[in-house]
A protein has these predicted regions:
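Short secondary-structure boundary segments
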Residues: 1-7, 33-40
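Metalloprotease/metallohydrolase-associated module, dominated by Zn2+-dependent proteases
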Residues: 2-12, 48-109
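Short pre-active-site segment immediately N-terminal to the catalytic Zn-binding motif
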Residues: 13-34, 44
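Activation segment
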Residues: 42-43, 87
């Protein structure tokens, strides 16, 4: 996965844009972060990229209304729960089933 530094991004943030990880500071990005972003790339591919971003935004807004917190909304999203829950498992993507993130939509935390 390609990792790109962008001075417009906060230092400890990383965003996956169409399979490219973008961060304000790339020195903190390790194998686990790269694996996390690769999981997002798999999610994007199965949704054909643009619908992923639309669903991601809609789910974040719904979770924000339910959680009243930007960070809690982010961490409770199905896409993020799959990625955070499996980013330490470097073999996860080989075993991952298609649309695995759907299993996290209504699953309690």
């Amino acid at each position: 996965m390609k990792v790109v530094r962008c001075s417009l991004m906060p230092r400890r943030w990383c965003i996956n844009l169409f399979g490219v990880a973008v961060s304000g500071d790339t020195s903190w990005i390790d194998r686990r972060v790269v694996n996390h972003e690769r999981i997002h790339t798999a999610q994007m591919r199965e949704l054909l990229f643009v619908p992923f971003y639309v669903l991601y935004g809609i789910e974040w807004l719904v979770r924000l209304v339910l959680c009243f917190s930007f960070m809690r909304a982010y961490r409770s999203m199905s896409f993020e729960r799959e990625a955070y829950g499996n980013d330490a498992d470097m073999g996860y993507l080989e075993r991952r089933r298609a649309y695995a993130w759907l299993g996290y939509v209504f699953k309690s935390q």
